[in-house]
Swiss-Prot record:
Organism: Salmonella typhimurium (strain LT2 / SGSC1412 / ATCC 700720)
Record InterPro entries: GlnE, GlnE_rpt_dom, NT_sf, PII_UdlTrfase/GS_AdlTrfase
Pfam families assigned to the protein according to its UniProt record, in alphabetical order: GlnD_UR_UTase (PF08335), GlnE (PF03710)
Upper lineage: Bacteria, Pseudomonadati, Pseudomonadota, Gammaproteobacteria, Enterobacterales
Chain segments carrying region Adenylyl transferase: 450-947
Protein name as annotated: Bifunctional glutamine synthetase adenylyltransferase/adenylyl-removing enzyme
């Protein structure tokens, strides 16, 4: 065993002072001194449980002792009588065994592969032990879940990721998916439950037993987000539901995740065999699947973006050449060829590496280097985490922990360890890059083209200097360009740019100037780009991105030239530069029905319990998607209707994620309202009004929302901190508003306006569905019924959605006096015009002036409220374009008039989108859109001016 280094020998004196009575310095073995000096976790544990140290001193941990874990846990749980004592014993057992593993790992008593095996078996043992105890307890309470034939149904648990692969790290969380075989009901209990309810309750209790922090800590952080539909899906799924999902909706990234999936307990019963057989075709295709390559490229970009976004230069998992890249290399071959090569179907990385070598898919030397690097990195990761039982992969900055790791990795000192680490990660990165090889590089022609611009950049030409490369520009344009360059250089003098940043900037600027100054609008474009560059000069990573990827630079120039809004966004949030790397996705926004899934995948990379990171990730995702929508808008690949569709689908995905996050936080604190035990869903709905309800969002639109619940009176929550059920929903709505409006470094998510709720700002933030119906029928003003025309549920379970739709239909199909309605709608419009009157008399306000967008909206709303009692089909849609279509189809409005209003409406909205991209207000010269305005005014007079 390597003697303690000098810094650690000195630290030993601090350890001695903390030892419990009875343990003297001389009574401890050299091994004990080494472990207790290395790991604060081990030291804290033996201080609390001195008997563990005596046990370790008398009998060292063995390589195969994982075989005894199940028996040891069974003994520990023998006296457990309730959930509280179960949680206590699970935490005690986990800590005791983890100290043994830390001891064996620190002293290298067991090889590193076996350490990974022990960590994984411990987790599996605890999961299965807790499940089995809780299953029996739930059966005593509610009966045994059975299928229609009376066969008992088990809860099957898929361990995902490193747990499934038998490669768990020291302080890992665990990714699980719960399933049960067949529908049915419980039998033999005090009350019957259907199987879905039984297994959901069992799953909730199991997660609580493992995940909930107590005075004894927790067992594992449990992450359930890999299940179908993520947090918005059922906690537990039947086999049939799982099969439907993976056949119909399973994504590529879910295939990657499923490669490592393993049933906890490794049972070989009929149910387990059925589940394995059902999942295998989804993961491994029968043919050689080269479609993986594009997904592979996307994943590579995702890794690179994550490293840049989170500044992970010292991260041995996510950094360049880190653990994730090795896992990624191996999965590539599994997914491409695994269906044809059974040897590639292993869940574990090292056996799969051996198969890759045997199949000659990589050179033997590369495989050998990857194997050595993997074991080196995994040992370093586990040692790092065992210091404090902390989930981290970032190298320490303090001298003590650096000395600990250097000693634990058998290096002379920290610089030697860093040198070895750098070599291993460089080998991994080389193989990783060669596997895809899609990095861009400058061609000799591009170098030759940019060379003359080096003089312009580096020699600080004055306004009256002449240079051949600027000769094509007009005098004023040339002067502006030179002034902008000179001002930018002066700005740089105020910034703390290091030598590397200066070097990269000097490489980048000639290329940038060559591209910008070839444009007719060179000065305008450069004036938009230099603020962005000034903002990132101290962040060399982003300069390197633009320097190393010429395509990204070209897209940056094109988008900034087209839109100051995009230029401003990029300057405020430079992480969006990552989106420029792939033109295939930049100009092709996410499919309208895929935003929720894309966001779910994006959020999986963020710890579920880290609220701050979750808030940042939501905002970053929104900004990236907005950039892609705007880029497609500028490129002309999205018509105006589609722009709004995409912006609306994006907003709905964000609402879904925010509600999920708020719900999770509230349930963790209070439990859920007890009435939900008797129904599916959450008893909560979010209704979108205005532009959101009408599928007409713009780039900077806020969200008009109201919140509904169906909680009866006198219902309490079922958590340890009970509160009134209706109070729960009020706090939930407040939490949602907070998550939307909290300002982080990435800004706010959306401005949310909830004043359209019953009684407006004076009313309760969240309303019961019954109270909402009563208000709409007996108290609401006509303008509130107009608003209801453009309202729809944007988040909610089917039961509440149906209830809201029925209320909306009832209100809209109520017969009204035509004259009274006409007067009220017209007077409301006149009030709005007086209140929001155009302050630019020589300009036409596209939205608010006569003949503008609001007039068209009022015409549509008036006609729906006037005629829906005769033509109920008019209530079907909430957007103006389809309402106009319905008015024509149902004979209310002449088809020619409806078509003309639709064209006018989309034309005006298109102009508003483009003005937003130019960061211009929504008004134009009075001479603009005269034809459209005249048409709208004529229609207004026809329908809303009294005869």
């Amino acid at each position: 065993m390597t003697p303690l280094s000098s810094p650690l020998s000195q630290y030993w004196q601090t350890v001695v002072e903390r030892l419990p009575e009875g343990f003297t310095e001389t009574s401890l073995s050299v091994q004990a001194k080494s472990v207790l000096t290395f790991s604060d976790f081990a030291l804290d544990s033996v201080i609390a449980h001195p008997e563990w140290l005596a046990e370790l001193e008398s009998a060292s941990p063995q390589a195969d002792e994982w075989r005894h874990y199940a028996g040891w846990l069974q003994e520990a749980l023998a006296g457990v009588c309730d959930d509280a004592s179960l949680m206590r014993e699970l935490r005690f057992f986990r800590r005791r065994i983890m100290v043994r593993i830390a001891w064996a790992q620190t002293l290298s008593l067991v090889d590193d592969e076996t350490i990974l095996q022990q960590l994984s078996h411990l987790a599996e043992t605890l999961i299965v032990g807790a499940r089995d105890w809780l299953y029996a307890a739930c059966c005593r309470e509610w009966g045994t879940p059975c299928n229609p034939q009376g066969v008992p149904q088990p809860l099957l648990i898929l361990g995902m990721g490193k747990l499934g692969g038998g490669e768990l790290n020291f302080s890992s969380d665990i990714d699980l998916i719960f399933a049960w075989p067949e529908h049915g009901e419980t039998r033999g209990g005090r009350r019957e439950l259907d199987n879905a309810q039984f297994f959901t309750r069992l799953g909730q209790r199991l997660i609580k037993a493992l995940d909930q922090p107590t005075m004894d800590g927790f067992v594992y952080r449990v992450d359930m987000r890999l299940r179908p539909f993520g947090d918005s899906g059922p906690l537990v799924l039947s086999f049939a539901a799982l099969e439907d999902y993976y056949q119909e909706q399973g994504r590529d990234w879910e295939r990657y995740a499923m490669v490592k999936a393993r049933l906890m307990g490794d049972n070989d019963d009929a149910w387990s065999r059925e589940l394995r057989a059902m999942l295998r075709p989804f993961v491994f295709r029968r043919y050689i699947d080269f479609s993986v390559i594009q997904s592979l490229r996307n994943m590579k970009g995702m890794i690179a973006r994550e490293v840049r976004r989170r500044g992970l230069k010292d991260n041995i998992k996510l950094g360049a050449g880190g653990i994730r890249e090795i896992e990624f290399i191996v999965q590539v071959f599994q997914l491409i060829r695994g269906g044809r090569e059974p040897s590639l179907q292993s869940r574990s990385l090292l056996p799969t590496l051996d198969a890759i070598a045997a199949l000659h898919l990589l050179p033997e030397n590369d495989v050998a280097q990857l194997r050595v690097a993997y074991l080196f990195l995994r040992r370093l990761e586990n040692l790092l985490q065992s210091i404090n039982d902390e989930q981290t992969q970032t190298l320490p900055a303090d001298d003590l922990n650096r000395a600990r790791l250097a000693w634990g990795m058998k290096a002379e000192n920290w610089p030697q360890l860093v040198g070895e680490l750098t070599d291993h990660m460089a080998n991994v990165r080389r193989v990783f890059n060669e596997l895809i090889g899609d990095d861009e590089a400058d061609t000799p022609q591009e170098e030759e083209r940019s060379e003359p611009w080096r003089e312009v950049w580096q020699d600080a030409l004055q306004e009256d200097d002449s240079t051949p490369v600027l000769a094509h520009l007009a005098d004023e344009e040339r002067r502006q360009v030179l002034t902008l360059i000179a001002d930018f250089r002066k700005e740089l003098d105020k910034r703390p740019i290091g030598p590397r940043g200066r070097q990269v900037l000097d490489q980048l600027m000639p290329h940038l100037l060559a591209d910008v100054c070839s444009r007719e609008d060179a000065a305008v474009t450069l004036s938009r780009i230099t603020p962005l560059l000034a903002g990132i000069v101290t962040r060399t990573t982003y300069l390197e991105l633009l320097s190393e990827f010429p395509g990204a630079l070209k897209h940056l120039i094109m988008l900034c030239a087209a839109s100051p809004m995009i230029a401003s966004q990029l300057a405020r949030y430079p992480l969006l530069l990552d989106e420029l790397l792939d033109p295939g996705t930049l100009y092709q926004p996410t499919a309208t029905d895929a935003y929720r899934d894309e966001l779910r995948q994006y959020l999986l990379r963020v710890p579920e319990e880290d609220e701050e990171q979750q808030l940042e990730a939501l905002r970053q995702f929104k900004q990236a998607q907005l950039l892609r929508i705007a880029a497609a808008d500028i490129a002309g690949t999205l018509p105006v209707m589609k722009v709004s569709d995409h912006l609306t689908w994006l907003a709905e995905a964000m609402i879904d994620a925010v509600v999920q996050q708020a719900w999770t936080q509230m349930v963790a604190r209070y439990g859920q309202p007890a009435h939900l035990d008797e129904r599916q869903g959450r008893g909560f709905a979010v209704v979108g009004y205005g532009k959101l309800g009408g599928w007409e969002l713009g780039y900077s639109s806020d969200l008009d929302l109201i919140f509904l619940h169906d909680c009866p009176m006198d219902v309490m929550t079922n958590g340890e901190r009970e509160i009134d059920g209706r109070q729960f929903y009020l706090r939930l709505a407040q939490r949602i508003m907070h998550l939307f409006s909290t300002r982080t470094s990435s800004g706010i998510l959306y401005e949310v306006d909830a004043r359209l709720r019953p009684s407006g700002a004076a009313g309760m933030l969240v309303t019961s569905a019954d109270a909402f119906a009563d208000y709409q029928q007996h108290e609401a003003w006509t303008w509130e019924h107009q608003a209801l025309v453009r309202a729809r549920v944007v988040y909610g379970d089917p039961q509440l959605t149906s209830q809201f739709d029925a209320v909306r239909r009832t209100i809209m199909t109520t017969a009204r006096d035509g004259k009274t309605l006409q007067t009220e709608v017209r007077e409301m419009r006149e009030k709005m015009r007086a209140h929001l009157g155009n302050k630019h008399r020589d300009r036409f306000d596209i939205k608010a002036d006569e003949g503008g967008i609001t007039d068209i909206e009022f015409i549509a709303q008036y006609l729906v409220l006037r005629y829906a009692h005769e033509k109920p089909k008019l209530t079907r849609w909430s957007d103006n374009v389809r309402i106009l279509e319905l008015l024509a189809q149902n004979g209310i409005m002449d088809e020619h008039e409806a078509q003309a209003l639709t064209v006018a409406y989309t034309t005006l909205r298109d102009e508003l989108h483009h003005l937003a991209l130019q960061e211009l207000p929504g008004h134009v010269a009075q001479t603009c859109f005269s034809k459209e305005r005249a048409l709208v005014q004529a229609s207004w007079r026809k329908w809303l001016v009294a005869v």
